[in-house]
Amino acid sequence: MIITTTEQVPGYRVKEILGVVCGNVVMSKHLGKDIAAAFKTLAGGEIKGYTEMLTEARNIALERMIKEAEKLGADAVIGFRYSSSTIMSGAAEILAYGTAVKLEKI
């Protein structure tokens, strides 16, 4: 499966647009880690627990999007993007989305 942020894939042409595909996940940190993160914001610096949580969430959302594209028989997802939003304190939604397409080699 080819995943690209561009609208075209070098060496291929889009034969068929199958539709928008997406994958999302909402994740939160453990309360104890959330309290530790609050103290970290006072001192400054990277909050590693949240960085790890968001990295994991992006990977899960991407895998879910790929599964949706595979169900449609896609060769690629073009125009790929991530979006994130805060659901509540310590919880975030990550959305991976793009356009599932069939490709033809040129």
From Swiss-Prot:
Top-level taxon of origin: Bacteria
Name of the protein in its database record: UPF0145 protein Tpet_0165
Lineage summary: Bacteria, Thermotogati, Thermotogota, Thermotogae, Thermotogales
InterPro entries: UPF0145_dom_sf (IPR035439), UPF0145_YbjQ-like (IPR002765)
Family: Belongs to the UPF0145 family.
